[in-house]
Amino acid sequence: MDNMELWNKVCKTDPKYIKQVGFGARKFTAIDPQYQVRSITEQFGAVGVGWGWNSTTEYIHFNNGDVAVVSGVSIWTHADEKNIFGPFNGCRKFFDAGKGRLAEDAPKMAITDGLTKALSHLGFNADVFLGEMDGNKYAQDEKGKGNDAGW
């Protein structure tokens, strides 16, 4: 495999698996995580056989009572856990003390964030991370191709 072979195979994202999301002033393009799992499975085989991940989890307690969960995710490939890449961290707020609210899915979401970051460094969905799928221009281009992937 040449240096760019994997990257070139996995860098393009099917627009039907992305969406624009926003949290306050922060806006970005989100990729469906199940689509990402399918994409890496297409390249390396079934999870647990051709590829997989290891993760660590840490809970960080802040002075104001908030708690964050951080997961470090490493990907291994070729059924050889010695061929490992990472860790890449994902972080989510687990407990919001001000609202007295627990985010039960935060640990899972932190792992998903770490997995997405790890995959991005291998070239998966590079078009998203390079900003090629952001904003109205992309949506208009896709509509012009007969695809109604607009946001």
Place the predicted regions along the sequence by residue.
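N-terminal, Lys/Arg- and Ser/Thr-rich interaction peptides
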Residues: 1-37
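Intrinsic disorder/low-complexity signal
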Residues: 1-4, 13, 65, 112, ...
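Positively charged, aromatic-enriched nucleic acid-contacting surfaces
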Residues: 26, 31, 36-144
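Interfaces that engage single-stranded nucleic acids at replication/repair/recombination sites
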Residues: 2-5, 137-151
